[in-house]
Amino acid sequence: MEDFVRQCFNPMIVELAEKAMKEYGEDPKIETNKFAAICTHLEVCFMYSDFHFIDERSESIIVESGDPNALLKHRFEIIEGRDRTMAWTVVNSICNTTGVEKPKFLPDLYDYKENRFIEIGVTRREVHIYYLEKANKIKSEKTHIHIFSFTGEEMATKADYTLDEESRARIKTRLFTIRQEMASRGLWDSFVNPREAKRQLKKDLKSLEPCAGLPTKVSHRTSPALKTLEPMWMDSNRTAALRASFLKCQKK
């Protein structure tokens, strides 16, 4: 699964997922299903916001070219993928500026057009079950919830899907592709049933003998893409076209 993640997702997304897991003391090399799930969630959040802008009349528009968009305001603020301190700083800033109620939990996005925070969910189970779990956890009518599944289903608060049909179809197609790629490598079943995967992992670890003399040096280099992304997120004039270029699936 780890090899699949590094092949299928952009290095920027992989590094953000690794950083998030390490922040909570989790190891991407061991909890590989979670690693894949976090990468998938990050990519959906990026795709959700791509190409969506607000014009001078405060109308939502979709533009896919680069330079002409520099003066347009991005419709969505991406909160997911930041470290917790920076994420809460962004949330507090939005609340102070817009007057919206501060959420109890960190949301994934903020929609400047609808003036609401958005919680994105990607599930391997039934969408309505996952939606209810999210709603029960958040316990706030102010945060909008939008759930996607790998089977093409979706569910949103009050059936308000926020995005146009084409944008949502793009996300669903990507999720279906990820599922197909996992299935072709024999990874889908364990991804759907994490408990079985954990049992198999424990069994595999017990069967391994300590190996002496193996290289243990780990590279801590930061990818140029990540260095570009961090200041870009803080720049209100960043372009969706540049950010979208990071999201192409890299295949062998």
From Swiss-Prot:
UniProt-annotated site: Important for efficient shutoff activity, residues: K202, K203, K206
Site feature Important for efficient shutoff activity and nuclear localization, where: R195, K198, R199
GO molecular function: RNA binding
Record flagged with keyword Secreted: no
Subcellular location: Host cytoplasm; Host nucleus
Pfam families per UniProt: Flu_PA (PF00603)
Sorted UniProt keywords: Decay of host mRNAs by virus, Eukaryotic host gene expression shutoff by virus, Host cytoplasm, Host gene expression shutoff by virus, Host mRNA suppression by virus, Host nucleus, Host-virus interaction
Free-text comment about domains: The probable endonuclease active site in the N-terminus and the basic amino acid cluster in the C-terminus are important for the shutoff activity. The C-terminus acts as a nuclear localization signal. The C-terminus is recruited to host protein complexes involved in nuclear Pol II RNA processing.
Family of the protein in this entry: Belongs to the influenza viruses PA-X family.
Protein name stated in the entry: Protein PA-X
